């Protein structure tokens, strides 16, 4: 992987990630394909939304179908028929999500499979091996996602364990040609974030992710840690904000110098009838849309907006038709990609402030201070 920076506007950056499998323009939003599919989308439809990289989930794919079956097809790209880049997370966050069902030791995390109850040990080495088998273009280190809330002592202990696991991840990654990203932890404590980043830089990674945010903390805490941390990541390396978020969060992340984002929000919300539009959010199952023959968003160029009315989408939602979830997903993913394209163009033209002002004005929201 090569990372090139083309333009900056304030702290915001425009560039590209170059892989053997293609180029990803940054800032980039990466749709989440947990089980080797972005829910409801064919790879061709995903490509048409403007996505050029997606996520796979190490934890879930390791449990089902398992890497042996995936390797029989070649790798995850061949298995899911997506020949563009794939980033895989390490499984750390999913294990964190298991709560009391898991036990953390120096060696790794022991948990019971949510599928069959089998006892499984996931270590940094195992995570790297699984991600190598998946053929990931960007591999994430295995870390412990610090829970929120955590005392400074708890956050330090968690962060230090993650640093030791980062060393083991790097050693196991070895000669794998895929990019390897470190993950900055440290909870809501700026000093711990600094120690984490310094430790990761000493080990050396191809990119750096900001982890442990969007885990239930107040928005102002997320912004505070983002403000503190993003600038300190080496400028020549890509910066990835994990698991974030709403369209406004993407805009605020880009304003602070973030290059990459992922989140289940556009796809999950689509399946629940919550649709992102230029003016805000449309809840398509509301009765107000029953007779509305206008498109979902007249500024959107997606397949859904070009061909269907709000009334039809409301009807599909009321009938629980699968097509409704699919059309909603196409729209939400395209909306996110249009926001990212708008940000990239604005940075290139040195018009980011104008873009941001317009973005918030159309939603009737004030522009947050930087």
From Swiss-Prot:
Catalyzes the base-exchange of a guanine (G) residue with the queuine precursor 7-aminomethyl-7-deazaguanine (PreQ1) at position 34 (anticodon wobble position) in tRNAs with GU(N) anticodons (tRNA-Asp, -Asn, -His and -Tyr). Catalysis occurs through a double-displacement mechanism. The nucleophile active site attacks the C1' of nucleotide 34 to detach the guanine base from the RNA, forming a covalent enzyme-RNA intermediate. The proton acceptor active site deprotonates the incoming PreQ1, allowing a nucleophilic attack on the C1' of the ribose to form the product. SUPFAM superfamilies: tRNA-guanine transglycosylase (SSF51713). This is Queuine tRNA-ribosyltransferase. Belongs to the queuine tRNA-ribosyltransferase family. Pathway: tRNA modification; tRNA-queuosine biosynthesis. One of its GO terms (molecular function) is tRNA-guanosine(34) queuine transglycosylase activity. It is an enzyme of class 2 (transferase). Homodimer. Within each dimer, one monomer is responsible for RNA recognition and catalysis, while the other monomer binds to the replacement base PreQ1. It comes from Pseudoalteromonas atlantica (strain T6c / ATCC BAA-1087). Substrate binds at residues 89-93, 143, 185, 212. Zn(2+) binds at residues 300, 302, 305, 331. The keyword Transferase applies. GO terms for cellular component: cytosol. Residues 243-249, 267-271 are annotated as: RNA binding. The active site is at 89 (proton acceptor), 262 (nucleophile). The keyword Secreted does not apply. NCBIfam families: Q_tRNA_tgt, tgt_general. Pfam families: TGT. It catalyses: 7-aminomethyl-7-carbaguanine + guanosine(34) in tRNA = 7-aminomethyl-7-carbaguanosine(34) in tRNA + guanine. Binds 1 zinc ion per subunit.
């Amino acid at each position: 992987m090569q990372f090139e920076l083309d333009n900056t506007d304030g702290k915001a950056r425009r560039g590209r990630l170059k892989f053997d499998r293609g180029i990803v323009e940054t800032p980039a939003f990466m749709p989440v394909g947990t089980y080797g599919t972005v829910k409801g989308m064919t790879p061709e439809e995903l490509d048409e939304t403007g996505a050029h990289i997606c996520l796979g989930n190490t934890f879930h794919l390791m449990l089902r179908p398992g890497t042996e079956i995936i390797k029989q097809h070649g790798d995850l790209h061949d298995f899911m028929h997506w020949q563009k880049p794939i980033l895989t997370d390490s499984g750390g966050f999913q294990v964190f999500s298991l709560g009391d069902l898991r036990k953390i030791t120096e060696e790794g995390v022991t948990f019971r499979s949510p599928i069959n109850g089998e006892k499984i040990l996931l270590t940094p080495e195992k995570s790297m091996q699984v991600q190598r088998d998946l053929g990931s273009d960007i591999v994430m280190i295995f870390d412990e996602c610090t829970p929120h809330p955590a005392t400074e002592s708890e956050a330090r202990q968690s962060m230090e364990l993650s640093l030791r696991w980062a060393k083991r991840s790097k050693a196991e990654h070895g000669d794998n040609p895929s990019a390897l990203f470190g993950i900055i932890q440290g909870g809501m404590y700026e000093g711990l974030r600094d120690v984490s980043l310094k430790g990761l830089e000493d080990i050396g990674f191809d990119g750096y992710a900001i982890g442990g945010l969007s885990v239930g903390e107040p928005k102002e805490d997320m912004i505070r840690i983002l403000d503190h941390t993003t600038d300190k990541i080496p400028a020549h390396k890509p910066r990835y904000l994990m698991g974030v978020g709403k369209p406004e969060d993407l805009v605020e992340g880009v304003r602070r110098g973030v290059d990459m984002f992922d989140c289940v929000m556009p796809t999950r919300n689509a399946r629940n009838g919550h649709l992102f539009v230029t003016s805000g959010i449309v809840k398509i199952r509301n009765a107000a849309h029953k007779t509305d023959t206008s498109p979902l968003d007249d500024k959107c160029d997606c397949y859904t907006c070009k061909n269907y009315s709000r009334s039809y989408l409301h009807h599909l939602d009321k009938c629980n038709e699968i097509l409704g979830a699919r059309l909603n997903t196409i729209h939400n993913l395209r909306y996110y990609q249009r926001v990212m394209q708008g940000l990239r163009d604005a940075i290139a033209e040195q018009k980011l402030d104008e873009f941001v002002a317009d973005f918030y004005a159309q939603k009737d929201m004030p522009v947050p201070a930087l």
